[in-house]
């Protein structure tokens, strides 16, 4: 099991909670920065804040993983994700101490990806200005490609469907 975290604090909380409840530690940790696609584990104001960028939070998560390793005698690899695009990006992240990288968006348009051809073509046709931060159905910021559907949501003409599985929930206690 490999949870996605966005801070050293989150990594520590998950590891300690899993250990106390299940007597199990994560097999690895994915630390995802705010440049990722899809749902983001950050508030809107944190997305461009240098204190929350992958290069800043990665060392914090690595430090927590090392402390867990010392405490329990088990290495937890740290995998970096979010905004990693090129070989140079991979090199920089690995030099910061990551055990590996996770790249998702980079491979969406490949033959091996099972997304629909229409979805893939949307990626291929997109320009930088088409990428927007939206409020997802669970209340979290998300990075998405602008579309007519997104425009209708912004205008209040459409509402995203609620996920019946409740697999992602907002941490906003006011809701």
Regions found by a protein language model. Name each.
Residues 1-48:
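Conserved alpha/beta-domain cores
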Residues 26, 36-79, 85-175:
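Conserved active-site-proximal phosphate/metal-binding subdomains
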Residues 2-3, 78-80:
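Short catalytic-loop micro-motif centered on adjacent basic/acidic residues
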């Amino acid at each position: 099991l490999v949870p996605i975290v966005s801070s050293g604090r989150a990594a520590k909380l998950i590891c300690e909670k899993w250990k106390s409840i299940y007597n199990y530690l994560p097999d690895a940790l994915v630390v995802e920065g705010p440049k990722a696609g899809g749902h983001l584990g950050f508030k809107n104001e944190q997305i461009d804040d240098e204190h929350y960028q992958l290069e800043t939070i990665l060392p914090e998560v690595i430090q927590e993983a090392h402390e867990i390793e010392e405490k329990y005698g088990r290495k937890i690899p740290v995998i970096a994700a979010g905004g990693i695009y090129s070989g140079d990006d991979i090199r920089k992240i690995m030099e910061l101490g990551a055990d590996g990288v996770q790249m998702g968006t980079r491979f969406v348009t490949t033959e091996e990806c099972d997304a629909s051809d229409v979805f893939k073509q949307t990626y291929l046709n997109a320009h930088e200005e088409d990428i927007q931060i939206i409020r997802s159905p669970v209340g979290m910021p998300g990075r998405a490609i602008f579309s007519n559907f997104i425009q209708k949501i912004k205008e209040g003409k459409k509402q995203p469907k609620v996920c019946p599985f409740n697999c992602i929930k907002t941490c906003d206690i006011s809701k």
